[in-house]
């Protein structure tokens, strides 16, 4: 770590070569984190920004690349925290657990006025990912953006003609009050932003600019849909067009035709859109499950515009979805079978997580997650190897190496009270993808070819979503609700995977070791 160490020449070159929707950078780049005012929906507020923009710049690379992303912390607004970390959502970080970015699990935060180099390779993954602050609720204030790893040998390449910066679509909830200053559990966002623009339906809003995505009639587009949400899930659709899903959370899946996609916080889908309709403008809709849930006046909307169509807003009407996405219809393209034996409990270790809520905090197995002062990885490197020795007490579970693991998330109602209010809760596992052998809304188990992903909705009362994965990646890995306000309220645990081999598998750089002493020396006003 150092004072403003910079790859600025590389960044300048990257920016000069892009200049498209997001202004793509990477895989070697600076990423400066700073505060600035933004007005994405007609209302101005201070925000936490990556690269000075919302959403943050698209970061790209190819399968097999080494990513070297130098995060420079220039934050000055203490109401949104001056420190930061960056999590690379969906990247396995095999051998680089220290670069996973979860504050107080994998690292101490980067102090304001300092920088830290995230240096990791992506040898066997390609697809659609994203990055965000993983410190408290900071990403709700703006620090979030898309990340794409391209595959030069993409098995689906014959299905589309266009896949570039212009075909990335981000969906974000937006709040006019800083997360630390607002309610612990907001009732809903003030607006929904599609590629960083949206409309606010309240006072001071109005007909602000919306994102326009342009297509050419006759071409096939691979759109990469990324939910960078802090809370709501969205029902996404494009008037007059079906979508063919080919990728789920960085995993190729068999082609599946749908006309709407319910996408939860942290999830991603690639879909093919065939621009085979009349030259015109069509509404793109992303309706949240909380807040304003219609599209009157262009809220929750963007525009799909065919080349040569008039520069006007669409007049298309929403129709009832007839082939909505159903998670159980998604089938992985390669090696589709779930780990373990094809029967209930047919794994080396099975565990059911007991959720509860006391009005202010969420609990898993009667413990609410309170971030430790010493990161879990540092605890392991310092000699703590078993759950009894690892902090926070009761929130760290050790997992054996090279084992099959089954985790269940029962959502139950007792005496009229839901064990986890605010459902459905999307749960994200760091360091892995998993097979969803029982999905929300389903009572059956599928061990032969279940969807494989890294973020799953745990559904509503009566659901018992069940996942399986293999412990092949030593290190501490966060498992948490991706509604960021719920994570802040303790809805998380840590898997201490193969603690005995964690140190040898994850050699840490000196700069990582310097993070905690620097952070621990900060005045409370600089945290």
Curated annotation (Swiss-Prot):
**Residues bound to Cu cation 2:** 89, 132, 482
Which SUPFAM superfamilies does UniProt cross-reference here?
Cupredoxins
Q: Where in the cell is it found?
A: Secreted
The GO terms this record gives for MF are: copper ion binding; hydroquinone:oxygen oxidoreductase activity
Q: Which InterPro entries match?
A: Cu-oxidase-like_N, Cu-oxidase_2nd, Cu-oxidase_C, Cu-oxidase_fam, Cu_oxidase_CS, Cupredoxin
Q: Which residues form the signal peptide?
A: 1-23
What the entry lists under Pfam families is as follows: Cu-oxidase, Cu-oxidase_2, Cu-oxidase_3
What's in the keyword line of the UniProt record? Answer: Copper, Disulfide bond, Glycoprotein, Lignin degradation, Metal-binding, Oxidoreductase, Repeat, Secreted, Signal
Enzyme Commission number, as recorded: 1.10.3.2
Its cofactor is: Cu cation
Q: How is the cofactor bound?
A: Binds 4 Cu cations per monomer.
Q: List the disulfide bonds.
A: 108-516, 140-230
Biological process (GO), any one: lignin catabolic process
Q: Which residues are glycosylated?
A: 74, 77, 156, 209, 233, 242, 276, 317, 358, 366, 393, 402
Q: Which residues bind Cu cation 3?
A: 134, 430, 480
Q: What class of enzyme is it?
A: oxidoreductase
Chief location category: secreted
Domain Plastocyanin-like: residue ranges: 25-150, 162-306, 373-498
* Amino-acid positions noted as binding Cu cation 4 in the UniProt annotation, renumbered to this chain: 425, 481, 486
Q: Which reaction does it catalyse?
A: 4 hydroquinone + O2 = 4 benzosemiquinone + 2 H2O
Instruction: Name a GO CC annotation attached to this entry.
Output: extracellular region
| Function as written in the Swiss-Prot or TrEMBL entry | Lignin degradation and detoxification of lignin-derived products.
What the record says about family reads: Belongs to the multicopper oxidase family.
On subunit structure and binding partners, the annotation says: Homodimer.
Q: Tell me what this protein is called.
A: Laccase-5
């Amino acid at each position: 770590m150092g004072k403003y160490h910079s790859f600025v020449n590389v960044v300048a070159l990257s920016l000069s070569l892009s200049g498209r929707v997001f202004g793509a950078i990477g895989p070697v780049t600076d990423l400066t984190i700073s505060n600035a005012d933004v007005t994405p929906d007609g209302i101005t507020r201070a925000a936490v920004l990556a690269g000075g923009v919302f959403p943050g710049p698209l970061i790209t690379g190819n399968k097999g690349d080494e990513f070297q992303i130098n995060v420079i912390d220039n934050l000055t607004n203490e109401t949104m925290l001056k420190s930061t970390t960056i999590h690379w959502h969906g990247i396995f970080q095999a051998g680089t657990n220290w670069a996973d970015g979860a504050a107080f699990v994998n690292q101490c935060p980067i102090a304001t006025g300092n920088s830290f180099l995230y240096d990791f390779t992506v040898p066997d993954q390609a697809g659609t990912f994203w990055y965000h602050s993983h410190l408290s609720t900071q990403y709700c204030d703006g620090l979030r953006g898309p990340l794409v790893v391209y595959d030069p040998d993409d098995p689906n390449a014959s299905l589309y003609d266009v896949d570039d910066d212009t075909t990335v679509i981000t969906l974000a909830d937006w709040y006019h009050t800083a997360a630390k200053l607002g309610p612990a559990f907001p009732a809903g966002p003030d607006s929904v932003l599609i590629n960083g623009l949206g409309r606010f339906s309240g006072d001071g809003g109005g007909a602000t600019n919306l994102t326009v995505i342009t297509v050419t009639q006759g071409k096939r587009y691979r759109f990469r849909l990324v939910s960078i949400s802090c809370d709501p899930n969205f029902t996404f659709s494009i008037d007059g067009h079906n979508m063919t899903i080919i990728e789920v959370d960085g995993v190729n899946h068999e082609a599946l035709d749908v006309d709407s996609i319910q996408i939860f916080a942290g999830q991603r889908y690639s879909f093919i859109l065939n621009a085979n309709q009349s030259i015109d403008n069509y509404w793109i809709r992303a309706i949240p499950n909380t807040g304003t849930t219609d599209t009157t006046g262009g809220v929750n909307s963007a525009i799909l515009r065919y080349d040569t169509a008039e520069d006007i807003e669409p007049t298309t009407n929403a129709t009832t979805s007839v082939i909505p996405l159903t998670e159980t219809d998604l089938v992985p393209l390669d090696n589709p079978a779930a780990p373990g034996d094809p029967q209930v409990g047919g794994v080396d270790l099975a565990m059911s997580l007991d959720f509860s809520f006391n009005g202010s905090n969420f609990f898993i197995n009667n413990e609410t997650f309170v971030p430790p002062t010493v990161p879990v990885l540092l605890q392991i490197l310092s000699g703590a190897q078993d759950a009894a020795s690892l902090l926070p007490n009761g929130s760290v579970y050790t997992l054996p190496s090279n084992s099959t693991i089954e985790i269940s998330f029962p959502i139950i109602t007792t005496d009229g009270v839901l064990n986890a209010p605010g459902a459905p809760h999307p749960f994200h596992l760091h360091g892995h993808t998993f097979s969803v052998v029982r999905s929300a809304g389903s009572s059956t188990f599928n061990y032969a070819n279940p969807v494989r992903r890294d973020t799953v909705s745990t559904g509503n009362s009566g659901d018992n979503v069940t996942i399986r994965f293999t412990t092949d990646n030593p290190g501490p890995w966060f498992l948490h609700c991706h509604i960021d306000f719920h994570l802040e309220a303790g809805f998380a645990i840590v898997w201490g995977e193969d603690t005995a081999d964690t140190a040898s598998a994850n050699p840490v750089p000196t700069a990582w070791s310097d993070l905690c002493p620097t952070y621990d020396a900060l005045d409370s006003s600089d945290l």
